[in-house]
From Swiss-Prot:
Listed pathway(s): Pyrimidine metabolism; dUMP biosynthesis; dUMP from dCTP (dUTP route): step 2/2
Protein's organism: Cereibacter sphaeroides (strain KD131 / KCTC 12085)
Organism lineage string: Bacteria, Pseudomonadati, Pseudomonadota, Alphaproteobacteria, Rhodobacterales
Name recorded for this polypeptide: Deoxyuridine 5'-triphosphate nucleotidohydrolase
NCBIfam families: dut, PRK00601.1
Catalytic activity: dUTP + H2O = dUMP + diphosphate + H(+)
Amino acid sequence: MRPVVRVIREDWADAALPLPSYETAGAAGADLRANLPPESRAEGLVLAPLGRVLVPTGLRIEIPEGFEVQIRPRSGLALKHGISLPNSPGTIDSDYRGPLGVILVNLGAEPFRVAHGDRIAQMVVAPVVQAGFELVEGLGATARGAGGFGSTGTA
């Protein structure tokens, strides 16, 4: 069964902007748009190089139990402008009901303007498995062992 994420708009949000949507039939992520407060819509938000900003979407969501929403960067913004998410993927738990915002970071050399209505991120709805944790005396051996970063080679 396809999960349904329930959505409400903030009182101040621009109802003319579309809800999150998938651009293609095979898309994994639904696009999220910047829904700026009325006083910021004309000028947008300017993100300085190495700066961070919390961009409002004007939405609150109810995620079905057993699922999460992952907020991920848009590849075009990352490649063309250096715009990404510092906590990628950002996790939204099913019991969160607060405002949905997207933290953007500008890793580029130039200021970047976020305009009202811009597609700023993708949200992926994913199932969650909550594991149990057990304290043990030792861990099973593997071929890799404790080899960490780069231990499996570079090619």
